[in-house]
Amino acid sequence: MRLSIPPRTSRFAPAVFCVSRASVLWVSLLPGLLAGAGCKKSDSGASSSSSSASGDKAASYRFAFVTNNSSDFWNIAEKGLRKAEKDFGVRVDMFRPLKGEISDQQRFLEDIMVQNFDGVAISPINPDAMTSTFDRVAAKMPLVCHDSDAPKSKRNVYVGTNNIEAGRSAGAAAIAALKAANITKGKIALFVGRMDMQNAIERKQGLDETLGKLPGFEVLPVFLDKTDRALAKKNVEDALARYPDLALIIGIWSYNGPCIAGAVRASSRKDKPVIIAFDEEEETLKSVQDGLISATIVQRPFQFGYQSIKALKDLKDGKQVPTVVDTGILTVKKDNLEQFWNELRELKK
């Protein structure tokens, strides 16, 4: 069973979710937030946080929410977690591997299995390498994958973007921008942290479907940076220097947008390539505003947090839960940037 969040004017307004023709689930997601989160950093290069408010009263369940890196993208997801704590009377601990290492996620999960957690939601760094670990977790407690799936594992639910469709949307935005710039040939470069994560695999699949057969263009091998921002920027600098006919740059993960924008701004090239990004980092949105980035494909990280915790609680309560919760995407360009930006700033308060 798949649950989809349909597009609407505001990404953060109350939503109606359709489960199937036979059954409809109505959910109201108010944009109110629970403030007061504490954060701690371990010596092992990972950080964790939990709501200070959640300790003030007994929580029905304690859940863990594990990210795949420490990008600012996850700050919005944390707002969803704190809202879910308030709405559902649970406690949520958030874990972030600061360097995006699989070893951090493995350690988090081992600790979670021996501590008093009732369920875990995780964005898998390498789903194939972690399948056996995920299956051990799923044997002990409800397991939700968010942002990036582990479809071969025994996870209960995937909450997040349809990443193939997100890739297609990025490709469509790229084609429109190339046409507007009257660019008819050249190289295409893709930048991402790693290609063993399901969201990267699926976004590239969607991009390949739209760009792979574009006449006059050649897609280069993917540039990988292992979530190292300095390397991410250097990769762009190298590509700009190596390929004078570089026509299109696409950043597949959230931090790639700012890294690409910084490198292109500093470049001496007269003909700037078209840039397409993902997600809503502040520098990415500023670059959309000034025209350097043509479009960015944004997700709904608030819903990653909120819907993951809702799914975990429903599973613990013995309720029926859809196996996929599609949180939707939005293509942000200059013409709809201001409205999106205002909503985002309100959400971050």
Residue ranges and their predicted role:
Residues K40, S47-A59, F191-M195, N199, ...:
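Hinge/cleft segment of the Venus flytrap/periplasmic-binding protein
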Residues M94, P151-A176, L190, V222, ...:
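Short beta-strand elements at the ligand-binding edges of bilobed clamshell
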Residues A121-A139, L207, P221, D225-K286:
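Hydrophobic alpha-helical
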Residues Q105, V159-K185, L231-K233, E280-T284, ...:
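Hydrophobic alpha-helical segments within soluble ligand-binding/sensing domains
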Residues A58-G80, A84-E85, D93-D111, F117, ...:
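Extracytoplasmic "Venus flytrap"
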Residues F73-V90, A166-A173, Q198-F217, N235, ...:
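Short, solvent-exposed amphipathic alpha-helices that sit
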Residues P127-E165, K187, D279-Q289, I293-S294, ...:
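Flexible loop/hinge segments that line or gate small-molecule binding clefts
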Residues A35-G38:
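C-terminal motif of bacterial Sec signal peptides marking the signal peptidase cleavage site
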